[in-house]
Amino acid sequence: MSRKMTGIVKTFDGKSGKGLITPSDGRIDVQLHVSALNLRDAEEITTGLRVEFCRINGLRGPSAANVYLS
Protein backbone atom coordinates (compact mmCIF):
# COMPACT_ATOMS: atom_id res chain seq x y z
CA MET A 1 0.00 0.00 0.00
CA SER A 2 1.32 3.46 -0.87
CA ARG A 3 0.68 6.76 0.82
CA LYS A 4 1.05 10.21 -0.76
CA MET A 5 3.46 12.43 1.19
CA THR A 6 5.70 15.49 0.98
CA GLY A 7 9.28 15.87 2.12
CA ILE A 8 12.72 17.34 1.52
CA VAL A 9 15.53 15.67 -0.40
CA LYS A 10 18.10 15.01 2.33
CA THR A 11 20.81 13.56 0.08
CA PHE A 12 21.15 12.71 -3.59
CA ASP A 13 24.13 11.29 -5.48
CA GLY A 14 23.81 11.93 -9.21
CA LYS A 15 26.37 9.24 -10.07
CA SER A 16 24.60 6.39 -8.29
CA GLY A 17 21.12 7.87 -8.75
CA LYS A 18 20.32 7.22 -5.08
CA GLY A 19 19.42 9.38 -2.12
CA LEU A 20 17.11 9.93 0.84
CA ILE A 21 13.97 11.97 1.43
CA THR A 22 13.05 13.25 4.90
CA PRO A 23 9.23 13.08 5.12
CA SER A 24 7.40 16.15 6.43
CA ASP A 25 5.48 14.02 8.94
CA GLY A 26 8.67 13.19 10.87
CA ARG A 27 8.83 9.50 9.96
CA ILE A 28 12.12 7.80 9.12
CA ASP A 29 13.90 8.75 5.91
CA VAL A 30 12.69 7.17 2.68
CA GLN A 31 15.00 5.77 0.00
CA LEU A 32 15.01 7.64 -3.31
CA HIS A 33 16.12 6.22 -6.66
CA VAL A 34 16.32 8.22 -9.88
CA SER A 35 13.95 5.73 -11.54
CA ALA A 36 11.15 7.03 -9.24
CA LEU A 37 11.40 10.52 -10.81
CA ASN A 38 9.83 11.73 -14.04
CA LEU A 39 12.46 12.60 -16.68
CA ARG A 40 12.19 16.38 -16.33
CA ASP A 41 12.54 16.32 -12.54
CA ALA A 42 15.40 13.79 -12.68
CA GLU A 43 17.61 16.45 -14.26
CA GLU A 44 16.78 19.01 -11.54
CA ILE A 45 16.81 16.90 -8.36
CA THR A 46 19.23 18.10 -5.70
CA THR A 47 19.57 18.24 -1.92
CA GLY A 48 17.13 20.58 -0.18
CA LEU A 49 14.30 20.47 -2.73
CA ARG A 50 10.71 19.86 -1.60
CA VAL A 51 9.10 16.85 -3.28
CA GLU A 52 5.80 14.99 -3.37
CA PHE A 53 5.96 11.20 -3.46
CA CYS A 54 4.22 7.95 -2.64
CA ARG A 55 5.76 6.00 0.23
CA ILE A 56 5.95 2.27 -0.45
CA ASN A 57 7.37 -0.57 1.61
CA GLY A 58 10.38 -1.91 -0.28
CA LEU A 59 12.58 -4.90 0.48
CA ARG A 60 15.11 -2.63 2.21
CA GLY A 61 12.63 -0.40 4.03
CA PRO A 62 10.48 2.54 2.96
CA SER A 63 11.05 3.77 -0.60
CA ALA A 64 9.72 6.64 -2.69
CA ALA A 65 7.71 6.16 -5.87
CA ASN A 66 6.12 8.67 -8.28
CA VAL A 67 8.37 11.51 -7.08
CA TYR A 68 7.65 15.06 -8.31
CA LEU A 69 9.15 18.43 -7.41
CA SER A 70 6.64 20.57 -5.50
Curated annotation (Swiss-Prot):
InterPro entries: Cold_shock_CspA, CSD, CSD_CS, CSP_DNA-bd, NA-bd_OB-fold
GO molecular function annotation: DNA binding; nucleic acid binding
Any one GO CC term of the record: cytosol
GO biological process, one term: regulation of gene expression
Keywords: Activator, Cytoplasm, DNA-binding, Transcription, Transcription regulation
Domain CSD residues, every copy: 7-67
Cellular localisation: Cytoplasm
Cysteine pairings via disulfide bonds: none
Source superkingdom: Bacteria
Protein name: Cold shock-like protein CspF
Species name: Escherichia coli (strain K12)
